[in-house]
């Protein structure tokens, strides 16, 4: 397929997709904010900051010219940290054209507005129809995508034809893409799992075993599902790639920034110390605040998220997190608030 794709953001994920898609024959433009990074990538075919051991194919058009990047394609994929998405969307909004499709690769919930990434894009790209905006999520560490390892993603958009178009654009022999029209479910699953990854990492750092991690993952998925249903998501989405798939890889993998951050907290480091030494953003820290606020807004009980919030922002001991979760009142395993019990 000869689709042209513009990737806004030359972090790990933007770089990995540029490398992978270009190797598969796509016409790829990669926009980076800093001129010096662009110059390094053009001359050395390496990203100086992210995935620096991976060669960027010469066919990738690297630029810091926003207008040139926007004009190179009618399919834009925005791969910037979630809390920076709005500022980038504001800049590209005047450059949209009829037929442009914009896909968010960022996973998160905006702190100030509690909007998902597609909602942020819809806010800023006001002239676009809702069906032109989607997301591409799933269990996908950038390192493995850049190395051409088998990976699966889900393209979510309000209409199936638009989601299928994104699917076709990104599908390669080693990148298999599925379609879903439950955009909010895909976004909540793909964003809230970062909170659970921090919880899993805290358990690793404290020294808890596989039983505890399995409990955190499964009970964490249950509370993500409750929140998603309250926001209009379809329950089955959380059994898919953006639900259990993304949750498993993020909670288990040594590549996971959020799991690593949690592990260091479990080892006794402070959040400030960890963030100062990390080169990359751990989205789960900011998402923890947003998800807790969403849970309170929708009156949804999310005990694992609340426990992570107390450790991150209220100076609670990591050891107390599991103790508090284990001594909660008895519950049914499959439980929903009364107003959601008819949802299947």
From Swiss-Prot:
GO terms for molecular function: glycerol-3-phosphate dehydrogenase [NAD(P)+] activity; NAD binding. One of its GO terms (biological process) is phospholipid biosynthetic process. The keyword Cell inner membrane does not apply. NADPH binds at residues 12-13, 33-34, 107, 142, 257, 281, 283. Its EC number is 1.1.1.94. InterPro entries: 6-PGluconate_DH-like_C_sf (IPR008927), 6PGD_dom2 (IPR013328), G3P_DH_NAD-dep (IPR006168), G3P_DH_NAD-dep_C (IPR006109), G3P_DH_NAD-dep_N (IPR011128), NAD(P)-bd_dom_sf (IPR036291). Its main location: cytoplasm. Catalyzes the reduction of the glycolytic intermediate dihydroxyacetone phosphate (DHAP) to sn-glycerol 3-phosphate (G3P), the key precursor for phospholipid synthesis. This is Glycerol-3-phosphate dehydrogenase [NAD(P)+] 2. It comes from Salinibacter ruber (strain DSM 13855 / M31).
């Amino acid at each position: 397929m000869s689709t042209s794709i513009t990737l806004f953001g030359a972090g790990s994920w933007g770089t990995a997709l540029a490398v992978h898609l270009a190797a598969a024959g796509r016409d790829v433009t990669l926009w980076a904010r800093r001129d010096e990074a662009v110059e390094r990538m053009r001359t050395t075919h390496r990203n100086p900051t992210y995935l620096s051991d991976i060669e960027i194919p010469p066919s990738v058009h690297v630029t810091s010219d926003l207008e040139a990047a926007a004009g190179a394609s009618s399919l834009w994929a925005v791969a910037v940290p979630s809390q920076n998405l709005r500022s980038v969307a504001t800049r590209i909004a005047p450059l949209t054209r009829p037929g442009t499709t914009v896909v968010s690769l960022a996973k998160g919930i905006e702190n100030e507005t509690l909007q998902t990434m597609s909602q942020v894009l819809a806010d800023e790209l006001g002239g676009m129809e809702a069906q032109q905006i989607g997301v591409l999520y799933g269990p996908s560490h950038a390192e493995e995508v850049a190395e051409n390892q088998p990976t699966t993603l889900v393209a979510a958009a309000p209409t199936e034809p638009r989601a299928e178009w994104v699917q076709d654009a990104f599908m390669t022999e080693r990148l298999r893409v599925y379609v879903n029209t439950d955009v909010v479910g895909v976004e909540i699953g793909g964003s809230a799992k970062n909170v659970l990854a921090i919880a899993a990492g805290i358990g690793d750092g404290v020294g808890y075993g596989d039983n505890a991690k399995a409990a955190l993952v499964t009970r964490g998925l249950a509370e993500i599902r409750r929140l998603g249903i309250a926001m209009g998501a379809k329950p089955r989405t959380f059994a898919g790639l953006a639900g259990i798939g993304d949750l498993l890889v993020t909670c288990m993998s040594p590549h996971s920034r959020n799991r690593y951050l949690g592990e260091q907290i479990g080892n006794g480091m402070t959040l400030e110390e960890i963030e100062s030494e990390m080169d990359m953003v751990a989205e789960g820290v900011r998402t923890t605040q947003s998800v807790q606020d969403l849970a309170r807004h929708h009156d949804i009980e999310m005990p694992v998220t609340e426990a992570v919030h107390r450790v991150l922002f209220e100076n609670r001991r990591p050891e107390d997190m599991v103790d508090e979760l284990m001594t909660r009142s008895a519950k049914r395993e499959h439980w929903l608030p009364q107003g959601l019990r008819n949802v299947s």
